Amino acid sequence: CAAVHGDRLLLQPAEGAPLPAFDARSYSRPKDFVPARAADRITIDADAVVGDLCIRRVAAGDRFAPFGMPKGTKLVSDYLTDRHRSVLEKQAATVVCDERGIVWLVGETVDRRVAVHRSTQTILDIRLLPPDREA
C-alpha cells in the first residue's frame, strides 16, 4: 500500500483494486506557505496524521469533519449529496485515511483535524498521480 522512493512516499492501493495512486512528501513549513487549492492535491499538518495512511473507497456510514465546518461531523454521503454529486460519483468516491479516520475526501476537501494552522510546523503534501504515472 505504501512504498518509499528517496524522500517521497508513494501510496498505492492493494493489487487489483481500481483505485488511484498518490505521491506524498513532507517538509518543514516555509514562512510564505500557501495551502494547495487543487482537487488533486492537498497540503495538511503532518503532525496531525496518526499512523499509516491508506486509500479506499467510501464506505456506508463514513463520517468526517469537513474543513470549514466549525463543529461536529458529517456523513460523507450527505456531504456529497449537498454538493449535488450523482450516485455514480458517490460510489466512486475515494478517501485517504489514517488510523483515526478520513484525512481527505479526494477531489473535495480535507478533514478539519489535519488542516494547516498557524502552529503547523511540518507539511504533508499529497497529490493524486495521473493514470499514466501510476506504478
What is each residue range found by the language model?
Residues 1-135:
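AMP-forming adenylation/ATP pyrophosphatase catalytic core
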